[in-house]
Amino acid sequence: MRKFIFVLLTLLLVSPFSFAMKGIIWQPQNRDSQVTDTQWQGLMSQLRLQGFDTLVLQWTRYGDAFTQPEQRTLLFKRAAAAQQAGLKLIVGLNADPEFFMHQKQSSAALESYLNRLLAADLQQARLWSAAPGITPDGWYISAEIDDLNWRSEAARQPLLTWLNNAQRLISDVSAKPVYISSFFAGNMSPDGYRQLLEHVKATGVNVWVQDGSGVVYELFVAGKGKTFTAKPKPDAEIASLLAKRSSCGKDTLYFSLRYLPVAHGILEY
């Protein structure tokens, strides 16, 4: 399964959660099915001992991955074990590997596509709201808002309509905070990007902005080449990152679980 990569170092939480979380992001992969229940439960307990309070599932469906009953059941068990260990749980919904490709469509085609995305997200939210032994503490829309395709107010109207509807309908399923992420790559002026974020925030969806301000720390070193490869940073460097605290009460998130020293020998990377 192709990686869905956070392309910048950190995320700034524009609209804060009800508490300043210290969270770890788990990007579920099919190969994680090899982890035993005992290994996973031990890993979740270790996260709590290290001071983490939140597990963020980046997605619960990725294209056709995690659509089979046995795959979903395993994700449910993993999430339930996290909450049993005392972690809060933010559930990522549907991730489309071709999300950015579809943004090049006409306005009408884009609106139709975003409606299909919303339907898929609602399906995941309903599924996870009804899952036994799980109470999601928040929802994550597994997509990224860039600063290229939504530069003009006219161009961003389909986006804002989608997010308005997503916040309202997902909250109808379970009244928990809804999140999405965004990144700045210099395609807009800083003031224009700020305005875009304000428009998104007005929909009621909380925005995690990848802006390099030290709220999410990458725990890996990416390899060179077109195909994504990565290995964990040295343990001492990771320990230094885990000791950091963000300013102004911002949430601190780390990407990702599989690169933590406590996950070595449990989750492949």
Give, region by region, the residue ranges found by the protein language model.
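Positively charged n-region of N-terminal signal peptides that target proteins for export
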Residues: M1-F4
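Glycan-processing catalytic domains of CAZymes
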Residues: F19-Y269
